[in-house]
Amino acid sequence: MKRWILFAGIVLAGVASVVVSERQKVDVPASPAALLYLVADTEQELTRMPVSFTRMSDAEEIRIGNELALAYAGGEERDNTPEVAIVNRYLTRVGEQVARNAHRKLPYKFHYIPSPYFINAFALPGGHVYVGGGLLELMDSEDELAAVIGHEIEHIDHYDCAERVQREQALRQLPLGGLVALPIEIFEAGYSKDQELQADRDGTRLAVETGYSASGAIRMFETFARLYQEHASKAKTPQEELSRVAQQTLEGYFRSHPLPSERIAQVQKLIASEGWTARPERDLAVAYIFWTARAQAALDVRQYAHAEQLANRSLQLRPDQPKAFQVLALARFGQANFSGAAEAYRKILEIDNTSHPEIIAAYAQALAASDRRTGVTEFRQWVENVKGEKPFQLGVAEAGLALLAGDSEPVRKLEIELKQSSDGQAPAWIGELGWWYYLDANYQKAVDLLSDAVQQRPGELQMGLHLAWALIEVRRYGDALQRLEDAVYDPRIQSEKAMARAVAHWLAQQHDQALLDLKAALGGQPEWENSSWVKALYSPLAAQSVQEMLAERERRKQKSRIATTR
């Protein structure tokens, strides 16, 4: 009874601390951090209590571990992307190498948790080891991963995981068959300080026996030390607030593990006492995946220069990545580096020589924005090297580029062919031809083709948006605004739709409404303030209207500032 009273007191104290911390909470993705505070503190208190157990058999431990792992897998969303499969295979390969030197010969299994917010690793009884994406993302070498895996294997080797199960069974008065209901957080939380330091020592030794450098453990702990200092600092900007999302999940980790400085000192002492010589560390073979993910995250918040830098870093590690090249292309396009974007799109098409209509269209668009006169020449050079059957999309893009270069014959022939075609994709291609006519300043022809295409494919939102731009050019502002009003919501085109409304309202002399629409467009797509970007992609009238609206917005701001200071 006293034990239960003490346990309840600790839990209530933990809950109280979590409730108090809620006052300073920011809106972040769901995290186990708060529960980890509670579990970690509670577990550390309970491990100080004198409790002895009869050690369970290996077979029983393996069975319980398998049941817990199965329950954990069932409660998680499955991520079946190729990148997750690659990391899983890599983690298993490194883990199996390290596990060969483990004292207990258990059926070790290694699992990747693909979340950037899970900056931890943990083990389940019987041989299951989990490593989070957030932790892997912090690593520079395979030796660091080997040290982390060795640490978790040693928690299994020393029966720390099994004893935790027995402790929870006693506290909760559960039959062994009911242990599957245990929250996984009790294993994510750390063990006692002595157990953690022992796992550090023996885990490092395990990694060294496998052929890895002991410096991997030190490097990992040095990263923890840096983050330990950073996670307590207060964010001063929205960007820093965003970067602290993952760091906040570290708080549970630091509360449940020895200080990084203490762990570093212990490993350094171990290296000296064992006389281990320095070994070169191996590159983390999957690091490129995390660099690409960082690049994508920067692209998502329209930090184009940073996204380009990160994508280039990823491609240095692994040059044959279509995903990294796509991030690079979009980042360059967002900065109005259209020739650079075209180069990246071409790399994608060269790496994966299959039909990618959206990449072909983006490649052609980048070429057109870069240089209308020479775009078709470069495109045709690439087409000549395409092996096998050439997708119809190539002909559409080539005809459009030829039109911009002054040759209207290919697009004229293609238009006749498509209007006679029964292919279900024909209306979409006719709509693409309509947009090429818009870029060539033949606005009435653009309206005619796009109207025909939209009538046949009313659900094509981008096509409807293109029609609105063309309607603006022929002074049909009301029709353009109605088209934009009727379009369903799609976050991918909301900014462009807002700018089309702004231009239509501006030209219709509805300036106040135009400036409201301008604000909405800029909030979602800051590229609109780049005159080079706008001029390359839209009509001279649209580009001029955007510049006039930006100037009027600045004039009104200046007027407001002057009025405020009086």
Annotated model-derived regions:
Residues 531-536:
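Acidic, Ser/Thr-rich low-complexity linear motifs
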Residues 2-455, 459-469, 475-502, 508, ...:
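A Zn2+-metalloprotease active-site environment signal
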